[in-house]
């Protein structure tokens, strides 16, 4: 179910509004090329009307993910735009994903992973996507934020999603009806893998590794999360890793720290 805002200026644009569901919903998907967003694109294509994939080049060290977003768009015969915000990315220093620091290795829920936070990344991308949606009269913008992101990334949490949607209702009041679709918000990565398997997503055609090498490294937080998710979901992982077994020890150490 996707909610919609009311068109027309109002004293309270945050009030209750009509519901639009199913194939009638014209949806733009933010797609990085990763497992979560590619699965979301397939889900939207199967259940709604996928109007466009929007990706962002913000000088991320793993920008090879954008090629996987392009492949997804081709597979789903959807228009695909890569928005160049490299000038913005240059200003967002301090993150291991945009600056010269090393990408941390280990479990994705460790405190050390906080260096992968890019300040305000989702808010910036979503603001652009909502503008695109308004311009082309789409009904919704969909993003693949999920439960596994909540610990590290503040702009993936339920409170952010609710606040951002409220802000957009005010920003577009009297202009457009755009809702914020986040079907994975309270799901685990393993849940998303199961959903992707149901939708027959070609998982080998997705990219997660933050290091951006020739293969998934198998050691960074996103590689560990990806490998563990397939294991917990009971789904074969087609991904070739440079270190395919590191995740086991990383998960064991994380559990031990939680119990200590």
Kindly give the residue locations of the regions a language model identified.
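Compositionally biased, low-complexity intrinsically disordered regions
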Residues: 2, 9-14
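A polyampholytic, Gly/Pro-enriched intrinsically disordered region
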Residues: 104, 201, 228-231
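Charge-dense, low-complexity polyampholytic segments
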Residues: 141, 210-217, 235-243
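Local cysteine-cluster metal-coordination motifs and their immediate loop/turn environment
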Residues: 207-228
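Short Fe-S-cluster ligation motifs
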Residues: 224-260
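ATP-dependent adenylation/nucleotidyltransferase module used to activate substrates
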Residues: 17-199
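Serine/threonine-rich, low-complexity intrinsically disordered segments
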Residues: 4-7, 23
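Short, charged low-complexity linear segments at domain edges
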Residues: 184-210, 248-255
């Amino acid at each position: 179910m996707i909610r919609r805002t009311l068109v027309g200026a109002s004293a309270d644009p945050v009030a209750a509004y009509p519901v639009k569901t199913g194939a009638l919903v014209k949806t733009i998907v933010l797609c990085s090329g990763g497992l979560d967003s590619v699965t979301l694109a397939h889900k939207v294509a199967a259940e709604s009307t996928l109007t466009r994939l929007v990706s962002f080049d913000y000088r991320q060290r793993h920008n090879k993910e954008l090629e996987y977003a392009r492949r997804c768009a081709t597979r789903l015969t959807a228009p695909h735009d890569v928005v160049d915000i490299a000038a913005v990315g240059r200003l967002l220093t301090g993150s291991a994903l945009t600056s010269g620091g090393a990408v941390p290795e280990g479990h994705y829920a460790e405190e050390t992973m906080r260096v992968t936070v890019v300040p305000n990344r989702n808010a910036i991308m979503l603001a652009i996507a909502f503008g695109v949606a308004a311009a082309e009269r789409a009904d919704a913008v969909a993003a693949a934020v999920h439960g596994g992101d909540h610990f590290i990334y503040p702009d993936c949490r339920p409170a952010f999603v609710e606040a951002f949607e409220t802000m957009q209702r005010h920003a577009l009041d009297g202009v457009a009806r755009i809702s914020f679709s986040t079907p994975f918000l309270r799901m685990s990565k393993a849940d998303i893998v199961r959903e992707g398997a149901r939708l027959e997503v070609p998982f080998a055609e997705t990219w997660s590794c933050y290091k951006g090498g020739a293969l998934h490294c198998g050691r960074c937080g996103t590689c560990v999360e990806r490998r563990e998710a397939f294991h917990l979901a009971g789904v074969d992982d087609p991904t070739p890793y440079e270190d395919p077994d590191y995740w086991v020890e990383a998960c064991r150490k994380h559990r031990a720290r939680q119990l200590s």
